[in-house]
UniProtKB/Swiss-Prot annotation:
Organism: Streptococcus thermophilus (strain ATCC BAA-491 / LMD-9)
Active site, renumbered: C184 (cysteine persulfide intermediate)
EC number(s) on file: 1.14.-.-
NCBIfam families (alphabetical): PRK00142.1-3, PRK00142.1-5
Any one GO molecular function term: oxidoreductase activity, acting on paired donors, with incorporation or reduction of molecular oxygen
Keyword Transferase: no
Name listed for the protein in its UniProt record: tRNA uridine(34) hydroxylase
Top-tier EC class: oxidoreductase
Record family assignment: Belongs to the TrhO family.
A GO biological process held by the record: tRNA modification
UniProt keywords, alphabetically: Oxidoreductase, tRNA processing
Length: 327
């Protein structure tokens, strides 16, 4: 039996005239039909994730497919029991994907319509994973990789996507002469990043067409060789990919035990995404470090209305105090 809510993930690189007005009109339409989600609009295209019941999402897909240049836009559809978003946002940005090129000159940005890596089907990508001479590079953020990733994929030491070009340049000698295959959640980041690799001089560059979400739904590969869960940017936080032999790879930030539950650090000025159990969240006041635990704006403390005495007691239980930083 079908679930009542559909989640649509999509993007398309396509020139949009008067993109700011397009974004405003798009928001008005989405609100008029009761859709929820988050959409980015730029001169270079559109990128979004939205959710609603069957009728609402069908209206939205029909509307998007009626727009110039978007007749063939590919919607990736998940069925869920509950809404994946609470509100509806449509925002105009300079780019739907920001690579963070060092000169900050948008004119030198990559246009995936002109330069991008070869598309690989899920089966072709699985073959690449099994090929010892192919480098498989995860283009997502570190916290996304830590929750789940393809077996054997390289984890760049980056906090966000715009740090990736510099990381690759720093490690260029390790795989410049090899075949390089990249992947991301739905494909939008790889379209641009694989094009950047081509421009950098990499000779054999591929990308997982449709991203991890498509790989997990493919009837042939069934998500095999994916370990852990897929981080998604909505209320679901994590979804399954591997339907053959799933395992947990996420580790609790505090004690290293298997964990797939993400929270944001209680310190709003840190906001690091960490994996942790409810028990350890309570024990460590949702702070990823001593400084975050004792920060005067710690959200966990305020949300749970903890007194100073209660905070002191919990800190003492882990060998800390309000004014002493652990060695």
């Amino acid at each position: 039996m079908a679930k009542p809510i559909r989640v649509l993930l999509y993007y398309k690189y396509v020139p949009i005239e008067n993109a700011e007005q397009f974004a405003a009109d798009h928001l008005a339409f989405c609100k008029s039909i009761g859709l929820k989600g988050r959409i980015l609009v730029a001169d270079e295209g559109i990128n979004g994730t939205v959710s609603g019941d069957y009728e609402t999402t069908q209206k939205y897909m029909d509307y998007v497919h009626s727009l110039p240049g978007m007749e063939d836009l590919w919607f990736k559809i998940d069925e869920e029991e509950e809404q994946a978003f609470k509100k509806m946002f449509v925002r105009y940005k300079k780019e739907i994907v920001h690579l963070g090129l060092e000169d900050n000159n948008f004119d030198s940005d990559i246009n995936p319509l002109e330069t991008t890596g070869a598309y690989l089907s899920p089966k072709e990508f699985k073959d690449a994973l099994l090929d010892e001479d192919t480098v498989v590079l995860d283009t997502r953020n570190d916290y996304e990789y830590d929750l789940g990733h393809f077996r054997g994929a390289i984890r760049p030491d980056i906090r966000n996507f715009r740090e990736l070009p510099q990381w690759v340049r720093d490690h260029k000698e390790e795989f410049m002469d090899k075949r390089v295959v990249v992947y991301c959640t739905g494909g939008v980041r790889c379209e641009k990043f694989s094009g950047w690799l081509v421009r950098e001089g990499y000779k054999d560059v591929g990308q997982l067409h449709g991203g991890i979400v498509t790989y997990g739904k493919d009837p042939e590969v069934q998500g095999e060789l994916w370990d852990g869960k897929l981080y998604v940017f909505d209320e679901r936080i994590a979804v399954d990919v591997n339907h053959v032999d799933p395992i947990v790879v996420g580790k609790d930030w505090f004690d290293g035990t298997p964990c797939e539950r993400y929270v944001n650090c209680g310190n709003p000025f840190c906001n690091r995404r960490i994996l942790t159990s409810e028990e350890n969240e309570d024990k460590y006041l949702r702070g990823c470090s001593h400084e975050c635990r004792v920060h005067p704006r710690n959200r966990y403390v305020s949300e749970n209305d903890l007194s100073q005495e209660e905070v002191v007691s919990r800190l003492a239980a882990i060998g800390e105090s309000l004014d002493v930083t652990p060695a």
